Amino acid sequence: MSTVGLFHFPTPLTRICPAPWGLRLWEKLTLLSPGIAVTPVQMAGKKDYPALLSLDENELEEQFVKGHGPGGQATNKTSNCVVLKHIPSGIVVKCHQTRSVDQNRKLARKILQEKVDVFYNGENSPVHKEKREAAKKKQERKKRAKETLEKKKLLKELWESSKKVH
């Protein structure tokens, strides 16, 4: 038998691209699995709550400061970091999640709206309710994992004891 036959592949070894060339990484992820792919911009506002208190632009104080963090000179020299203050409550939000000032302004307003709603409504706020539900789900998952671990230990003990008998 020759060595050529051992290395014969039925299909060419080429990379198959799942999406057209011009798409960015998060767009490719969205095409592959639309429910899973989340960009950092979408993560900032977390969810869109229609029942939140509305913000009055007259009660807001907005500043643009220089950025920080990874990105080097392009990030550190431009003033695209938004500092938004709600004057009546004194809540301050700093947003520097994107390089765009407009996107940072929108994100800062969403985050401030959530924080102001929690400040005034407390435990009745939809944001606070969601946090409680998430904590409850986490606790349930932890409890199930602990029960599963105990069952596995018991099964292992039974298996080892039956092994010693034979």
From Swiss-Prot:
- Segments carrying the region annotation (Disordered) are 122-148
Region of interest called GGQ domain, as start-end residue ranges on this chain: 57-121
Q: Which organism is it from?
A: Homo sapiens (Human)
Q: How does it assemble?
A: Interacts (via C-terminus) with MTRES1 (via S4 domain). Associates with mitoribosomal S39 large subunit, peptidyl tRNA and nascent chain.
Q: Where is the composition biased (Basic and acidic residues)?
A: 126-137
- PANTHER family for the chain: MITOCHONDRIAL TRANSLATION RELEASE FACTOR IN RESCUE, PROBABLE PEPTIDE CHAIN RELEASE FACTOR C12ORF65
Clinical disorder: Combined oxidative phosphorylation deficiency 7: A mitochondrial disease resulting in encephalomyopathy. Clinical manifestations include psychomotor delay and regression, ataxia, optic atrophy, nystagmus and muscle atrophy and weakness. Spastic paraplegia 55, autosomal recessive: A form of spastic paraplegia, a neurodegenerative disorder characterized by a slow, gradual, progressive weakness and spasticity of the lower limbs. Rate of progression and the severity of symptoms are quite variable. Initial symptoms may include difficulty with balance, weakness and stiffness in the legs, muscle spasms, and dragging the toes when walking.
Coiled-coil region(s) = 127-160
Kinase as a keyword?
no
Designated name of the protein: Mitochondrial translation release factor in rescue
| Localization terms from the record | Mitochondrion
The source's superkingdom equals Eukaryota
PTM comment: the record says: Methylation of glutamine in the GGQ triplet by HEMK1.
For whether the record's keyword set contains RNA-binding, the answer is yes
In the record, the note on similarity to other proteins reads:
Belongs to the prokaryotic/mitochondrial release factor family.
Question: Where in the sequence is the transit peptide found?
Answer: 1-35
